[in-house]
Amino acid sequence: LPSQSIDAVLSAQAFHWFANMESLKEIHRVLKPQGHLGLVWNQRDTQVDWVNALAERLSPLEGDTPRYHSGLWQKVFEHQPLFQLKSLHQFAQQQTGTVEQVVSKRLLSTSFIAAMPLEQQQDLKHQFEQIVQQYTGKQPQFEISFPYITYAYHFQKIAE
């Protein structure tokens, strides 16, 4: 892309994968003066007991996979002259569907789980569904609302 040709760059559920100075410099280069960088993540609402139990089951499996909740992605914004945080908005939302749809299949799509052998994924699916049943009494085919907190960051390009 040509330099200073873009009004805004938006990254949803992804910036933690490429949170480095090289990426920030390239985004800064293509943004017009006073351009905007938006970063958005949906995070499981671990204030809810059954969601927290699922998160605790997932945590040991993460390894060194880049994750939003580790906060490591934020380090690239420390002491850099390219972007200024203008705002952070947080809001609650839910995804509703069957336990299998919005819990099991969603968790199985997580990068480090999707890379596992199918047999291990199926075992985890069963464990996820057991956790939900233990806390909520809901079977895989029952409807449930999975709570999330959305974090929306707005950065503005600092003029050169």
Where in this protein do the model-derived segments appear?
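A short acidic, Gly/Pro-enriched loop at the edge of an enzyme's catalytic core
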Residues: 1-9
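Short glycine-/acidic-enriched loop or helix-start segments at secondary-structure transitions
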Residues: 2, 20-21, 48-50
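Catalytic core of nucleotide-sugar-dependent glycosyltransferases
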Residues: 3, 26, 36, 41-42, ...
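A short beta-strand submotif of the Rossmann-like class I SAM-dependent methyltransferase core
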Residues: 8-12, 20
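A short, conserved alpha-helix within the catalytic core of class I
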Residues: 17-27
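Conserved catalytic/acceptor-binding region of the Class I
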Residues: 28, 32-97
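Conserved Class I S-adenosyl-L-methionine
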Residues: 71-160
